[in-house]
From Swiss-Prot:
The lineage of its organism: Viruses, Riboviria, Orthornavirae, Negarnaviricota, Haploviricotina. Plays a major role in assembly and budding of virion. Completely covers the ribonucleoprotein coil and keep it in condensed bullet-shaped form. Inhibits viral transcription and stimulates replication. Plays a major role in early induction of TRAIL-mediated apoptosis in infected neurons. The gene is M. InterPro entries: Rhabdo_M, Rhabdovirus_M_sf. It is found in: Virion membrane; Host endomembrane system. This is Matrix protein.
C-alpha cells in the first residue's frame, strides 16, 4: 500500500554510486501543461494584506528508477499533513512549490533539480498570512516508498520581505502549477474588490 511519511532516508553518495545514471524526467503519463503566466502589478485594491517577497525555491527529486508527474502529485496530496514549516506561510510555500515544479529540471547525478528565483507579490485575506517583517527558511524532505520504488523530494524555500517591485502570481486553470495547487489544497478566495485577484487564506 502506498503511503507517505517523513523519513531520514536521503539521496546519499553511496546511492549515487549505485545508480550512476540520472533518472528520466517526468514523461507525458499525465497532462503536461505550460507554466503559469505572471501578471505585472498595476494596482492593488482593497484591504488585503499585501507583501512583496524575494523568493528562492528549490525542489530536488531523488529517484533511482525515474519518476512521473503522477507520483509528484500523489506525494503532494498529503502536504498539509507533513509540512513542518511556519503555518502562517504554508500558502506561500505551496505557491512556490507549484511554480518551481512548473519549470524545467536540471540533472544532477541521480537527481533532478527544479529552481526558481523571483520577486512575487502575495495578497492574504485579513487576519491571514505572515507577520510584518517575518521571513521564512524552510527545508524538508518528503518521501514516497512502496518497497518497490522510492521517490524523495527535498524542498527548500527561502522567503524574505523586500522592497523590490514584484509580480503577482495568478491561477491559470490550464497550468501544471494549478494542478499541483489543487492537489495541495491551496486555500484561496476571490478578492471582493477585484474579480481577477485571488487572496490567500493560509
Amino acid at each position: 500500500m502506498n503511503f507517505l511519511k517523513k523519513m531520514i532516508k536521503s539521496c546519499k553518495d553511496e546511492e549515487t554510486q549505485k545508480y550512476p545514471s540520472a533518472s528520466a524526467p517526468p514523461d507525458d503519463d499525465d497532462i503536461w501543461m505550460p507554466p503559469p503566466e505572471y501578471v505585472p502589478l498595476t494596482q492593488v485594491k482593497g484591504k488585503a494584506s499585501v507583501r512583496n517577497f524575494c523568493i528562492s525555491g528549490e525542489v530536488k527529486i531523488c529517484s533511482p528508477n525515474g519518476y512521473s508527474f503522477k507520483i509528484l502529485r500523489h506525494i503532494l496530496k498529503s502536504f498539509d499533513n507533513v509540512y513542518s514549516g511556519n503555518r502562517r506561510m504554508i500558502g506561500l510555500v505551496k505557491v512556490v512549490i507549484g511554480l518551481v515544479l512548473s519549470g524545467s529540471p536540471v540533472p544532477e547525478g541521480m537527481n533532478w533539480v527544479y529552481k526558481l528565483r523571483r520577486t512575487l507579490i502575495f495578497q492574504w485575506a485579513e487576519s491571514h498570512g505572515p507577520l510584518e517583517g517575518e521571513e521564512l527558511e524552510y527545508s524538508q524532505e518528503i518521501t514516497w516508498d512502496d518497497e518497490a520504488e522510492f521517490v524523495g523530494l527535498q524542498i527548500r524555500v527561502s522567503a524574505r520581505q523586500c522592497h523590490i517591485q514584484g509580480r503577482l502570481w495568478c491561477i491559470n486553470m490550464n497550468s501544471r502549477a494549478c494542478q499541483l495547487w489543487a492537489d495541495m489544497i491551496l486555500q484561496t478566495q476571490q478578492s471582493p474588490d477585484d474579480e481577477n485577484t485571488s487572496l490567500l487564506l493560509e
